[in-house]
Amino acid sequence: LEAPRRQVEGGQVDYLMLDYLAEVTMSILQKQKERDPKMGYARDFIGAIESVLPGIVERGVKVIANAGGVNPRSCADALLELADRKGVRGKLALGVVTGDDLLPRLDELMAQGHALANMDTGEPLALVRDRVLSANAYIGSTPIIEALGKGANIVITGRSTDTALTMAPLRYEFGWGPTEWDKLAAGIIAGHIIECGAQCSGGN
């Protein structure tokens, strides 16, 4: 919980990126949401951002986080409640990226003839449909860029690609187009290094 505060207070920071999700995390969050419809997001995001929220607003730092898990809107609601307590709600422009949750559409997709086959075994999803806890498409950087372009200073997503959280500000700030492959490749490498935290400082 100290890392965001140290980053925000320790120097000139334009963007703070927080990555919370892994494949197994989505199933855990889905179970939480089934027990309580207001849950299903990374609640430790709210704790991590609490001490730095006034500083983020004061310094103009933008935040991008996939802390929305399987319930980005509830995560946004919790963040707005925190902003109320901190007295900064009027200074926040919050963007919420949705569209990754395909669980409600699985039966529709299979009925349209999509086998959604297991990549290793080739078996169709229908064989294990009753055991599926979550089904998410990976969202790229484009909707995050759209949120930034509309003035959002905090963007919460559901299941985005790990690199999208870094790629979005790079594309937004430097105007990289969708076919500038060398620049996009560099952004993907930067994103992978950053989202794997300790690798930024030589760890593994």
Predicted regions and their residues:
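Metallocofactor- and cofactor-centric catalytic cores in central/energy metabolism, strongly enriched
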Residues: 1-116, 124-143, 149, 154
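Catalytic or ion-translocation cores adjacent to nucleophile or general acid/base/metal-coordination motifs
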Residues: 82-104, 166-204
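Catalytic alpha/beta core domains of metabolic enzymes, predominantly
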Residues: 117-141, 145-149, 155-157, 161-192
